[in-house]
């Protein structure tokens, strides 16, 4: 049946499960399914019960915990009050992402499968288990599992004679460029006086805005959608002097572990959670976390803007595009925010010289390459045949977005796609504060 609805859900910690879910969504759309891609925390067990076909991608966090975007859904699915026949209408396919170097390999996916079966759901095909220890990473198990998934779904929902499934993605046979999830509206350029506003706070505001828009794209209604709430989050971040940065591991050890100490004695007590403490007491308690905001070198940001032909002082507004997943209640996001400078968006949001991008980055980049040689190489990296070469070039050699863009100098993606396919800068936490 053409237009059969397919719900794709993910529980992600670092973004890998979300990346796989987005890939399944794109491939499903090309196969004439009506696809919605949502975080597991965007739905309830009762909503899942109303679905007939679901694909779920789940990673394992820490020592077997549920991933970040599943931590609300998982306890609700474990409620003893749920009837055992709740999911009798659901046929599901489940893929787990894990690392066999850990004792609880893919335990979150295995637990979820067990609970779904307890609630009378049925499996479309056997569970797939991706392993980061494989030479090609989790893609080595994912690619054949996806072939089985589409075969099973097509047997269940055959197409009419007038429609056909696309050929498998391979080198030299890339699908058309997918529409972007984000809509970027240009609204002029900022004045020289405006560009001298506090760069740190403006870049932090940009990261808050993009995070909320991405949540809206994935069906999660942000807890607060106004610019004033974003500004309150920005104002909760402070600068503190660094007075100790000592390496704990020996210089010959492969891992650089450091002891970092910050002086927070001058921070306003009202800005810290435990503000009831006396002035003579430390304004924190055992177990608190300090989240550190990364900053990128100005020269790196300027070089990236030059390479991508972006205007640093252009002002833009961000919103989910018409192609993004809508809210479960059918309403579009009403997130409102002041315009953001492109430079602040790049510097505050995109990890241009840190993390290596995902596989989809190379597929998108291939559509913008002006050189046949570069396009062929990018298509090869994005194909199943090129996954081991991609693993070596991208992950093991730790290529950054900036380095890849200079390697493929004729490919210049639009800002909408850069915001979608680049790895986002993220706060990192220091425990044992």
Regions found by a protein language model. Name each.
Residues 1-433:
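FNR-like FAD-binding dehydrogenase module
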């Amino acid at each position: 049946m053409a237009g059969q609805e397919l719900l794709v859900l993910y529980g992600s910690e670092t973004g890998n499960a979300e990346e796989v879910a987005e890939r399944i969504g794109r491939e499903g759309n090309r196969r004439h399914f009506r696809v919605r891609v949502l975080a597991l925390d965007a739905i309830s067990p009762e909503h899942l019960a109303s679905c007939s076909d679901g694909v779920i991608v789940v990673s394992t966090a820490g020592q077997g915990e549920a991933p970040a975007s599943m931590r609300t859904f998982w306890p609700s699915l474990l409620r003893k009050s749920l009837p055992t026949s709740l999911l009798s209408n659901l046929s599901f396919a489940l893929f787990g992402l894990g690392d066999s170097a850990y004792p609880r390999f893919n335990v979150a996916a295995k637990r979820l499968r067990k609970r779904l079966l307890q609630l009378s759901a049925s499996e479309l095909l056997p569970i797939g288990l991706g392993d980061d220890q494989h030479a090609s990473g989790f893609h080595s198990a994912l690619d054949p599992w996806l072939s089985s998934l589409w075969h099973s779904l097509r047997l269940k929902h055959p197409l009419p004679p007038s429609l056909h499934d696309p050929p498998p993605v391979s080198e030299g046979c890339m699908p058309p460029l997918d529409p972007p999830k984000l809509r970027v509206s240009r609204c002029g350029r900022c004045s020289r006086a405006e560009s001298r506003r506090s760069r740190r706070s403006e870049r932090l505001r940009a990261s808050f805005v993009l995070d909320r828009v991405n949540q809206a794209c994935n069906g999660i209604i942000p807890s607060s959608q106004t610019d004033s709430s974003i500004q309150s989050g920005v104002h909760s971040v402070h600068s503190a002097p660094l007075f100790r940065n000592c390496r704990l591991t020996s210089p010959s050890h492969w891992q650089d572990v450091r002891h970092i100490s910050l002086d927070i004695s001058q921070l306003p007590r009202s800005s810290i959670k435990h503000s009831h403490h006396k002035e003579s007491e430390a304004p924190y308690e055992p177990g608190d976390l300090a989240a550190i905001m990364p900053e990128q070198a100005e020269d790196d940001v300027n070089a990236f803007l030059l390479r991508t032909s972006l205007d640093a002082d252009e002002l833009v507004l961000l919103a989910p595009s018409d192609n993004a997943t809508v809210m479960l209640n059918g309403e579009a996001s009403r997130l409102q925010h002041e315009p953001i400078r492109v430079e602040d968006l790049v510097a505050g949001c995109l990890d241009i010289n840190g993390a290596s991008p995902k596989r989809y980055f190379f597929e998108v980049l291939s559509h913008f390459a002006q050189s046949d040689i570069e396009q062929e190489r990018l298509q090869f990296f994005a194909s199943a045949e090129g996954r081991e070469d991609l693993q070596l070039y991208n992950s093991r050699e730790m290529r950054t977005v900036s380095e890849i863009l200079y390697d493929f100098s004729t490919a210049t993606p639009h800002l909408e796609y850069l915001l979608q396919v680049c790895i986002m800068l993220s706060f990192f936490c220091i425990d044992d504060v």
